[in-house]
């Protein structure tokens, strides 16, 4: 998932670029769009052209898979799950069976990803519309109120990310999606019809609550209904649809130059996928894991039949119950996340998102326009295309390797590449011996950084979190980790430009390189590999190692 640095930073980047790089208003306006567009790299690449690669990944994910829409199960076999710390081992039976499955998962993953589309769309829609809505609402000269319109989405998302876990545990995953559609639709409607700044901010706040809930439950639901063999590939689809939402927002802004009031339509159109999400989830199966955990075994059997086929009902219900999903242990409370039993794994989830935000994606986003111009690339569109292509390629590669190379390996490779890229960027600005090549080196460093980020640091955390958390704490722990993401995102947005002004961009880049190195060391020592394991196997491994 990605994560999102757009909201506060788009506005801050605009102010900085207007002050530093351009005095021409039209150029500044382009700078807003470009900076916002690239900051979406933190949510993942513009992955639209990667759909063919995704299809190939799904088709190759396991030799037993006969087609993308009909999953074959591989032979059941014992897998020795190694614990993450003490080296203890547990024998577990994966949720697999022999024979061809008559169920299908993809349509329901697609419905869930409407939430991801809305996530990306609401992040990106204000980027092109801000200048026009500011004029329409009479705040063209008031950058403070413009900042509130932008950043209120982040505030709402922080609330939503914490709320999503509790709702998912209490009402179930599908019902929470339906509840989530309410603030998403109302927020979009208020923004589209706003006649005052106050109404606009309330609309953005509600939309933020909606995308905050989506950021928690979309990866959670997908991970819980996906077959073990292709869970990594399906989990990375979340990134794809976030980027489709971002791209849709970018395209939706094209008529603005000819029709300044088009910004209202841009916000209003988001009501449609919100309604479709609510309707689609009314026909989608609930997570079998949640149902068994609630003691609703008969409903779980129906969900398993829909998702995996009637051939697997008995086997999967038995395995889910045996793994502890059906135990009478009460649902975990928020304070349980900080207990000695769970804190280690919860801290891993929070740390991954903190490293993601502190590793410098914001700096690369902010300065990419000036970096490309220093290399003679004057077109913002060309620069965006280059950064976008790097994102597309990186995530396409990551999705194809997710179930082969593994999540942990991708994270290590990603943060290692980001560290080297940051070092190259820092040297390109300060090392006089490289002055003649500084522009070219800066572009190379930027592209390599974005490519490295999209290989692991961008897409893996949102996929990994639902996998490493025990079923009893999964929803709340995912929500807590994503809440840390939104909070750190907001804080970085407030102080980043001040730090750059005081220390200089080269020193800041060097600091980011150090953070990436720390991330590599932390991941190597604390993150457990989840490739090829069922969620039950992972839970056994982490519990035995606690």
From Swiss-Prot:
Pfam families: Sugar_tr. The keyword Plastid applies. SUPFAM superfamilies: MFS general substrate transporter (SSF103473). It is found in: Plastid, Chloroplast inner membrane. Its main location: plastid. GO terms for cellular component: chloroplast envelope; chloroplast inner membrane; plastid. Keywords: Chloroplast, Membrane, Plastid, Plastid inner membrane, Sugar transport, Transmembrane, Transmembrane helix, Transport. Gene3D superfamilies: MFS general substrate transporter like domains (1.20.1250.20). May be involved in the efflux of glucose towards the cytosol. NCBIfam families: SP (TIGR00879). Belongs to the major facilitator superfamily. Sugar transporter (TC 2.A.1.1) family. This is Plastidic glucose transporter 4.
